[in-house]
Amino acid sequence: MKGSIFRHPTPLPLGVSSGYVMTVLGPLPISEMGVTLMHEHILLDASGKWVPPCCCSDRHLAEMPVKMENLGELSLNPLMSRDNCQLFDVDVAIEELTKYRALGGETVVDPTNIGIGRDPNALARIARLTGLNIIMGTGLYLEPSHPEWVRTSSVEQLTERLIYDLGGAEEKPEVLAGLIGEIGISSRFTPDEEKSLRAAGRASAATGVPIEVHLPGWERLGHRVLDILEQEGADLRHTVLCHMNPSFADKRYQRELAQRGAFLEYDMIGMSYYYADESAQSPSDEENARAIRELIDDGYIQQILLSQDVFLKTMLTRYGGHGYGYILKH
């Protein structure tokens, strides 16, 4: 992997055991992370999730910018608007994150990765201007978002790419990733998604950097994912399983995953959308709170992570959404 040599600390602290986490502005002691959101997209191109309406009468909404007149329709089917799936504006990101900072937020983990609009230099600028610690992801999301070169790459080649992004190679990028993820797993769990997951496991084993895995929340693929990561040498205690909210009622499933060491991430807090592509409603905050309370009562408080997974314009306060500060405010 070719890159430029930049001035990073030598030796570069890598992985959980180093006591540091890598932000877009450099290493930060884990003890100084403070109030942290573990799963929020700052800049993102989620156009791959865009599903134009099938009804002729709704097709005008597909290319309409997000505005007051279509917020109601987008609450019922948020992915039918291409514009809603695009977070491109750095100034809007700064405005939204400044509100989170004012509420006491200190760190944001942004799992936007390769192929879905990751912008390292812009994230570094946003971190400087907001005063927030921003941790950037690496790896691959769902197969439709994979760059063409992924199809012909081996697990070894993908692993090498991730290690480079994390600063584990001799040559390093200017802005380093501090997380492997969010690694995309679909309900079809395609061969290329498995290849990507195996590379993530190997890169984590080599560097000690944690992994975040996007699970199809209404499915039950958690054990299969953990089995593969275990085969590749990853430490399951440094593995985050995302989108656990939809499986909140399956107590046995979630507790079995936690017993294997994984973190359970309830990252759909405040999300009230109906997802037409899943024919499913996001769990309510009451359902989330009850499930989290029961996990705490059962002794899993150290393995629960909370976030809101901001990834649409309609989730930003500028467009009538809760923004990044919902958990801290409510």
Q: Which positions does each model-derived feature cover?
A:
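Active-site beta-loop-alpha junctions enriched in small/polar residues
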Residues: 41-43, 113-114, 139-143, 182-185, ...
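Histidine/acidic-residue-rich catalytic or RNA/ligand-binding cores of hydrolases
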Residues: 46-48, 120, 221-227, 250-257, ...
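Active-site gating/metal-coordination segments in enzymes
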Residues: 107, 125-128, 133-210, 263
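Alpha-helical scaffold segments that flank or form the walls of functional sites
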Residues: 38, 43, 54-112, 116-130, ...
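Short acidic/histidine-rich active-site segments
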Residues: 212-214, 266-268, 300-321
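Mid-to-C-terminal alpha-helical segments outside catalytic/metal-binding sites
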Residues: 14-27, 31, 322, 326-330
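Glycine-enriched alpha-helix->loop->beta-strand junction motifs that scaffold or abut catalytic
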Residues: 131, 207-210, 230-237, 256-265, ...
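Distinct, well-ordered alpha-helical segments
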Residues: 121-124, 149, 190-195, 218-233, ...
